[in-house]
Amino acid sequence: MATFGAPATANSNPNKSYEVTPSPADSISSLSFSPRADILVATSWDNQVRCWEISRSGASLASAPKASISHDQPVLCSAWKDDGTTVFSGGCDKQAKMWPLLSGGQPVTVAMHEGPIAAMAWIPGMNLLATGSWDKTLKYWDTRQQNPVHTQQLPDKCYTLSVKHPLMVVGTADRNLIVFNLQNPQTEFKRIQSPLKYQTRCVTAFPDQQGFLVGSIEGRVGVHHLDDSQQSKNFTFKCHRDGNDIYSVNSLNFHPVHGTFATAGSDGAFNFWDKDSKQRLKAMSRCNQPIPCSSFNHDGSIYAYAACYDWSKGAENHNPATAKSSIFLHLPQESEVKAKPRVGATGRK
């Protein structure tokens, strides 16, 4: 309990989530679950890519550290091959590594850019790796070849990308959203100005490939449909705000079974939403640090999220003595993530 006159100490784990150990030594930049098993990969600013095996017995969770690899500089992003055998990672050393995790093989460099690699995705239908960089290019890689299959010029630095074959959405600086139909990957399908007024932080494609979500630094999410006849279904909503304090939306994840989605933000909270009934299903308690990244496991029974300093307030506000980086696992209740009709309303914009 707080002493009278002294501020209460914010809780680092107010949702009583399971903590994965050991924690990375520096801020966590991405979390990716295997599409086939409960194996979690984290990338971090201490140049590391780490892997844990997660096991569950009823409501109890356990984690076992399995392996790790190093980059030469901070690692920013990660992706899994669709068969769950291989992890890809990229970052400030301007290269992407392929790590044959399940076979115990050594990592090899499979992609190079002229600037940091900010985002990546494996494209299952094409057996290609897509990498997006601050060098204003998107590259497609056949991992057996030294040179990219194709280099696509982007209008600005790549910040984020998402693939749900055949749909790919790329978010760049200056609020550009570039949509690709991967059946014709060398041509832009559509270029859209973000429906949000501020810098794009994250995008994720709809599971049915009919559109995408976009999150911005101004505590807002846009729900966007690609078909011109569906534009009336587009809307934006505010989230990750506390009075006049507005926080970045850092991560968007669709639930693999229910089609609802999670947002995570720099306010330290994660929430579950239903875009079709336009309602929040569950608001979780705020951690005392930002949540920069998150991931559902393959069946949506586990939601992983990181809590750590996100550098949004600069180096001068970073206190290494108190800024612990943590990875937590939350077990979503069905009521938190299952879609439900909005009672007595037609939907709120």
Curated annotation (Swiss-Prot):
Matching SMART domains: WD40
Biased composition (Polar residues): 9-21
Disulfide bonds: none
Record-linked PROSITE patterns: WD_REPEATS_2, WD_REPEATS_REGION
Region described as Disordered: 1-21
A cellular-component GO term for this protein: Cul4-RING E3 ubiquitin ligase complex
Spans of repeat WD: 23-62, 70-109, 112-151, 153-190, 244-283
Subcellular location per the Swiss-Prot or TrEMBL entry: Nucleus envelope; Nucleus, Nuclear pore complex
Pfam families, alphabetized: WD40
Keywords: Acetylation, mRNA transport, Nuclear pore complex, Nucleus, Protein transport, Repeat, Translocation, Transport, WD repeat
Motif window: DWD box: 128-144
Signal peptide start and end residues: none
Residues with N-acetylalanine modification: 2
Entry keyword Transferase: no
Top-rank taxon, per record: Eukaryota
Keyword Nucleus in annotation: yes
GO terms for biological process, alphabetical: mRNA transport; protein transport
Quaternary organization: Part of the nuclear pore complex (NPC). The NPC has an eight-fold symmetrical structure comprising a central transport channel and two rings, the cytoplasmic and nuclear rings, to which eight filaments are attached. The cytoplasmic filaments have loose ends, while the nuclear filaments are joined in a distal ring, forming a nuclear basket. NPCs are highly dynamic in configuration and composition, and can be devided in 3 subcomplexes, the NUP62 subcomplex, the NUP107-160 subcomplex and the NUP93 subcomplex, containing approximately 30 different nucleoporin proteins. Interacts with DDB1A.
Family that this chain belongs to: Belongs to the WD repeat rae1 family.
Domain notes: The DWD box is required for interaction with DDB1A.
Protein name: Protein RAE1
